[in-house]
Regions:
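Short beta-strand edge/turn micro-motifs at domain boundaries
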Residues: 19-23, 141-166
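A mature extracytoplasmic/lumenal domain signature
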Residues: 70, 80, 129-131, 146, ...
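Sec-dependent N-terminal signal peptides
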Residues: 4-13
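Short, cysteine-centered beta-strand-loop-beta hairpins and adjacent loop/turn segments enriched
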Residues: 83, 132-141
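A solvent-exposed, acidic/Ser-Thr-rich amphipathic alpha-helical stretch
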Residues: 63-115
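Positively charged n-region of N-terminal signal peptides that target proteins for export
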Residues: 1-4, 17
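A short hydrophobic beta-strand element
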Residues: 121-131
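Short, low-complexity N-terminal intrinsically disordered segments enriched in polar/charged residues
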Residues: 16-60, 68
């Protein structure tokens, strides 16, 4: 009898199937503007890879790859410009111009976090990294945070903040 009971319990445990249900957890909060009160969820791996590839492609001077990942016009906001500027695709000339003062650029990414605001049709990926700009034997080091806006797997806006590294 003990053997039959043990066999029955073992069979019951083996035949049980664990059911896993994934739930998107919302967090954070929008505090200002038309989206006040809306929360965020973690964005997609696809958007994460696009943003990281874009950041690396710029440092490597692969402007054709950057053009493939962007919409017809990308709005770029960098603090020294004062306001967002529209960059028309292909952007090779614009990108070459802003890289022209430097012999080369390297970037070391610290982290990248994809987010999607509840109810929105786009995701943002915040990428923070160290950028080294080499020029005539000297190195200019910057801490940079890019917030890259992605809709339908295409970048349509980049907001950038930077500061110097001591």
């Amino acid at each position: 009898m003990k053997k039959i009971l043990l066999l029955f319990i073992t069979t019951a445990f083996i035949s049980c199937e664990t059911k896993i249900t994934e739930v998107n957890k919302l967090g954070g909060m929008t505090y200002y503007g038309e989206n006040t009160g809306k929360k965020f969820e973690i964005g997609s791996e696809v958007s994460l890879k696009i943003a990281v590839s874009l950041v690396n492609a710029y440092a490597e001077g692969d402007f054709d790859l950057m053009n493939e990942m962007t919409t017809d016009t990308v709005f770029f906001f960098e603090p020294s410009f004062g306001k967002p500027i529209p960059v028309v695709n292909p952007a090779n000339e614009f990108l070459s111009q802003i890289q022209s003062p430097y012999d080369s650029i390297t970037r070391r990414i610290w982290n990248a976090i994809p987010l999607k605001r509840a109810g929105s049709d786009y995701e943002t990926v915040t990428v923070s990294f160290i950028e080294n700009r080499y020029k005539k034997g000297e190195v200019e080091k910057l801490r940079i945070v890019d917030r890259i806006f992605i809709r339908d797997s295409k970048v349509f806006r980049v907001n950038q903040w930077n500061g110097t590294v001591d």
